[in-house]
Structures are given as structure tokens and as C-alpha cells.
Regions:
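Hydrophobic packing residues within well-ordered alpha-helices of enzyme cores
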Residues: 55, 78, 91, 107, ...
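Conserved acidic-Pro-Pro-aromatic motif
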Residues: 138-253
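Short helix-capping segments at alpha-helix termini
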Residues: 60-61, 84-88, 117, 169-175
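Short, well-ordered alpha-helical scaffold segments within catalytic/effector domains
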Residues: 24-32, 130-137, 159-162
Length: 254
């Protein structure tokens, strides 16, 4: 894996990859274990393309990857990294933010965490740039016949992303695994809530798993447990507690 990274301004994703050669090791193994040649992967909030490139290499020429990233600087590096790794043919990269509506939105930029841009204002002083908003379900409807893994990491707009994708997911022959970030405070700032996201995901009737990236394991959970956790986080003002969760069948690590 060869990646063109952000400069020292980015204290998170690029810095970690520069220092350790990997980003989110357990999530990386989850993505790779969920994909095989011919599979289809959708990366929502693709950043500079770390997971996109890994997935494209995994699914090969017979598979497909769709990567959505609204920030122009991240998107430039995403495209550069596709070319650098020779996987541009199997990736459709789209400079847009997925949402539950079409049109134009604002992306509020973080100066030191270039993976923490948000499509809502949380009251901080941030530069705002216009970005296209796209309904994921409508965009992908005629482009995919199957979907194996969906990764959503959008700094609080996960509910709107999933709302826009639900018509597609419900119409597929098989519901994909979904790897998604759950940050109740960010979801609230974006006009939703952690509980609302969990209840929406539960309509897919798939198992829930907590991604334990410390012990590198999946911990079985439930709609009720995760909704309760969200309520507990909401009860503490300013609590930015978060976790990644997996929705779908258990992953077989080989």
C-alpha cells in the first residue's frame, strides 16, 4: 500500500499512517475479511482513500468500489492514491457528501484533523465550503446489483447518509455488512441522535456488533443495548464518547 498523505497539518489519519503504516488496524482486518474478488464495497467518507485502495486491491478487476468524499483536498489525494496503486479502473470516486436530499450543502472544515470535516455547523468557527449533496440510494441504484460492505464515517451525518441509502439496501438480494461510526453528540449536533441511528439500522433486521479495537474482537450487542448506551452518553453534557459498530453477519477471520 502506497499513499500520498497530508502534510503535518493533519494530526490524525495521515500522521498515524506516516508513523505506523496503518490506520485503525482492527477495522482494516474487518474490511479485508469482508471482501473477496468480485465483491462490491462502498466507502462513504473516504478521506484520502486508505480503505478505498485496500478494498480495490482486494476485490480486483471483477469487483467494484465506490468512494464518496466531499472535501476537495482529500479528494485530490484520494485520486492520487488510486493512481499510485493502479486501482483507478475498479474505483468510481465521487466528490460529494451523501445525504437524505439532493442539492448543495456546506462542508465545515477542521484545520488540524482533515478527516473531521462536517456537513453541519457545531457552533465552532470553521471555514465553510459548498459541496454537492447526493442521495446514495439513488446514485447507486443503477450502478450496483450487489453490495458486500458499506463503510460510513461522516462525523455526525451518519443518520442522513443511511436514510438516503435505505431504499437501495432494502431492495438488494442480500443486506451488506455495514461498518459505521456511532458518535451520539455529533449526531445530535447534526440534527439527529444516536438512538435514532440505531433504530434506523435495526429496520434491516441484522445482528449488531461492537467493534472492540483494543482487544481486536467483535462483541455481540443489540438494538436495546446500543440505544441505551447512546442515551447514557447523551446524559453527560459534552460527552464525545464514540464507537464503531458492525451491522450484519459475523465476520470470519481467516
Amino acid at each position: 500500500l502506497k499513499l500520498q498523505l497530508h502534510d503535518e497539518r493533519d494530526r490524525f489519519v495521515s500522521r498515524r499512517i506516516r508513523e505506523e503504516g496503518i490506520w485503525e488496524p482492527f477495522e482494516t482486518s474487518l474490511v479485508l475479511a469482508s471482501l473477496s474478488p468480485g465483491a462490491v464495497f462502498v466507502d462513504v467518507g473516504a478521506n484520502i482513500g486508505y480503505f478505498t485502495v485496500l478494498a480495490a486491491d482486494r476485490v480486483g478487476d471483477s469487483g467494484g468500489v465506490f468512494a464518496f468524499e466531499p472535501d476537495p483536498e482529500n479528494f485530490f489525494l484520494l485520486q492520487a492514491n488510486l493512481n499510485l496503486n493502479g486501482v483507478q479502473r475498479q474505483v468510481e470516486a465521487v466528490r460529494a457528501a451523501l445525504s437524505d436530499e439532493e442539492g448543495e450543502g456546506g462542508l465545515y472544515l477542521s484545520e488540524d484533523n482533515l478527516g473531521d470535516h462536517q456537513i453541519y455547523s457545531a457552533g465552532e468557527v470553521r471555514e465553510r465550503i459548498p459541496v454537492p449533496l447526493v442521495k446514495g440510494g439513488e446514485y447507486l441504484q443503477d450502478r450496483v446489483e450487489r453490495l458486500d460492505l458499506l463503510k460510513v464515517d461522516t462525523q455526525g451525518s451518519e443518520y442522513r447518509v443511511m436514510s438516503g441509502l435505505m431504499p437501495l439496501l432494502r431492495g438488494l438480494p442480500m443486506v451488506p455488512r455495514i461498518l459505521i461510526e456511532l458518535t451520539p453528540l455529533s449526531l445530535q449536533e447534526a440534527g439527529s441522535s444516536g438512538r435514532a441511528l440505531i433504530e434506523l439500522l435495526a429496520t434491516l433486521s441484522q445482528p449488531f456488533w461492537i467493534v472492540d479495537h483494543i482487544e481486536h474482537r467483535l462483541v455481540a450487542s443489540s438494538e436495546a443495548e446500543l440505544a441505551r448506551w447512546c442515551d447514557n452518553v447523551d446524559a453527560v453534557a459534552g460527552d464525545r464518547g464514540f464507537m464503531n459498530i458492525l451491522v450484519g453477519s459475523e465476520v470470519n477471520f481467516v
